[in-house]
């Protein structure tokens, strides 16, 4: 903000990169330890958690006003990337070529964000530079110092989390994919949750939303791209359950942002409550899988019907209001 950069751009880039660091280190650590399923499920689970829980809780604190930049550009881009990841991983392998493509898209998107920092929008105004008692150089030194220590601590934490997750999966006889989608994803998404909650309390809704959208982009472009390259010529193995169930859910939750963001221009408390409900149903689905109940298919049909009913009714209701206006 000192440089007069809009909050939404900071959220989509700098803050998103910082909050996605745990996912990056944990997923890379998982690949190096031969646990591709943990690496991929961490990314997918984090993206689902970010949209349903982080946006849900943040909007319960205060309705999140959505800038038109998010609607017309960033969310469609996130949808396109999510669909591309689903398509490229449909064979069960995210190849190293796919990794190069994802990292190239990250480069293009970063250049795009930098070149449009001062873009004029109908509801975006560049933040005024704030006066700070310290010099910019002192701030920079302090920031770099914190960054170095943070990376060191994250590296140790990532190693412990991956080892602990693998041990837990072996002890309980649970697939690493489920551990990655739930426990690991929740743990690595805590920075996004805390950042967006603090931003919501301070009324910086741009930062709260931009952090989530930016983190979800980085999770797929940077983390999956890096992991697939780190896996060598064989590529990153993608569990069949992720391809059939969890990646489609990730794509659907991303699509769900459009009717919420596009109409009325904000995420209301009620919509945040619905997002949290959907995540609870998602976790219940995983619990039913572990318990091996026979009605898992019926429960999933209920989730899909609930999901479609809620968001279709919300979309139609808000669209009707816009037409009347």
Model-derived features: positions:
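Hydrophobic alpha-helical segments, chiefly the membrane-spanning helices
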Residues: 1-325
């Amino acid at each position: 903000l000192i440089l007069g950069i809009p909050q939404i751009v900071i959220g989509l880039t700098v803050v998103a990169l910082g909050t996605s660091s745990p996912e990056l280190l944990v997923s890379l650590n998982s690949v190096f330890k031969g646990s591709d399923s943990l690496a991929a499920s961490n990314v997918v689970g984090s993206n689902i958690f970010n949209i349903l829980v982080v946006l849900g809780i943040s909007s319960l604190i205060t309705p999140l006003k959505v800038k038109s930049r998010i609607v017309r550009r960033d969310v469609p881009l996130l949808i396109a990337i999510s669909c591309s990841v689903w398509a490229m991983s449909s064979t069960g392998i995210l190849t190293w070529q796919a990794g190069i493509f994802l990292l190239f898209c990250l480069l293009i998107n970063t250049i795009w964000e930098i070149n449009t920092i001062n873009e004029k929008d109908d509801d975006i105004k560049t933040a005024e530079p704030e006066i700070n008692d310290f010099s910019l150089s002192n701030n920079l030194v302090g920031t770099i110092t914190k960054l170095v220590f943070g990376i060191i601590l994250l590296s140790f934490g990532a190693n412990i989390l991956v080892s602990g997750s693998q041990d837990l999966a072996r002890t309980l006889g649970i697939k690493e994919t489920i551990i990655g989608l739930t426990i690991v994803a929740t743990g690595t998404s805590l920075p996004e949750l805390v950042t967006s909650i603090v931003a919501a309390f301070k009324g910086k809704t741009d930062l709260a939303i931009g952090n989530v959208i930016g983190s979800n982009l980085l999770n797929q472009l940077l983390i999956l791209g890096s992991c697939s390259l780190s896996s060598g010529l064989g590529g990153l193995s993608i569990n069949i359950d992720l391809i059939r169930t969890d990646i489609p859910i990730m794509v659907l939750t991303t699509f769900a942002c459009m009717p919420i963001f596009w109409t009325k221009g904000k995420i209301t408390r009620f919509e945040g409550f619905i997002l949290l409900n959907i995540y609870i149903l998602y976790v219940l689905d995983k619990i039913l899988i572990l318990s091996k109940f026979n009605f898992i298919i019926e429960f999933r049909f209920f989730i899909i019907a609930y999901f479609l009913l809620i968001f279709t009714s919300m979309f139609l209701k808000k669209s009707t209001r816009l037409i009347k206006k």
